[in-house]
Amino acid sequence: MKLYLAPLEGITSYIYRKALYQCFDGFDKYFIPFIRAKQNLNFSGREKKDISPENNSGMYAVPQILTRNADDFLRTANQLKEYGYQEVNLNLGCPSKTVVTKGCGAGFLARPEELEQFLDRIFSKTDMKISVK
């Protein structure tokens, strides 16, 4: 059995993950709370701290990406690859009203044709591992 630490925005920051890893090294993967994929490729201060390799040392950390734009997803995934990540996670589960009303997270599930095109594009254009929540 594999044990994964789920991402919870505002809870499982790098500080929480690091403390948990140091006290209980029982997780196979530590998912980082979502990063909003943007055209400008600039990570926020919180996002930079969360994805910093120094803040995730020793653990298999997986950044989560929130978007419904395939090109933004691919740009963000490529930038995360430069940080040394081998895998990213697509957030299709966030039920937050502010996320869903923008058609992201669980809101993307209401657009099956658009989602299928999105998934076809991202899986065909990157060699990174992609998991979906």
State where each predicted segment sits.
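Alpha-helix-loop-beta-strand connector modules within alpha/beta enzyme cores
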Residues: 51-62, 106-132
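Alpha-helical structural signal in soluble globular domains
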Residues: 23, 79, 83, 121-126
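Short, well-ordered coil/turn segments that N-cap beta-strands
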Residues: 1-3, 26-28, 54-61, 84-88, ...
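Alpha/beta catalytic cores of nucleotide-metabolism and tRNA/nucleoside-modifying enzymes
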Residues: 3-4, 9, 14-15, 117-121, ...
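Glycine-rich, positively charged N-terminal anion/phosphate-binding segment
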Residues: 8-79
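Non-cysteine beta-strand/loop elements that form the S-adenosyl-L-methionine
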Residues: 32, 86-95
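Glycine-rich, proline-tolerant flexible connector loops at the mouths of alpha/beta enzymes
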Residues: 36-41, 92-112
